[in-house]
Amino acid sequence: MVVMFSIEIRRTFAVRQGLPAPVRDAKNLPPLMPVEGFRVTMRVGFSFEDDQLGERGWFVDTDALDESVDRCAERLASGVWPEIFDFRPSFENVAKWAFTELASTIPQLTYVELDNETIGVATRYVRSH
């Protein structure tokens, strides 16, 4: 049995996805996104084994990762997603983008989750084993 630690870094902010909602539109329902945007918590997780703990008792100092996570969160909150990204910015595609952005700076990154708290739907992009 492999015993591992799992660490999660979280940031909460507002995003404006800006994509059409064909099902809601067909039923003449109002949009789900509030004027101020969806409230989203981004969760960034990484894992490591017991023998990877250093002499300070940690695998990595999470303070060192804050800059990368903050930069990613700021980009997601910086405007309407179709104006920010060159791809169709579904929550799935944006979670994958965030994972790719963070993978180079967060050792052993295992997932990035975008939890849309406004509508109660979370999308998690997970590294496959």
Predicted regions: what is each one?
Residues 1-129:
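Charge-rich, low-complexity N-terminal segments
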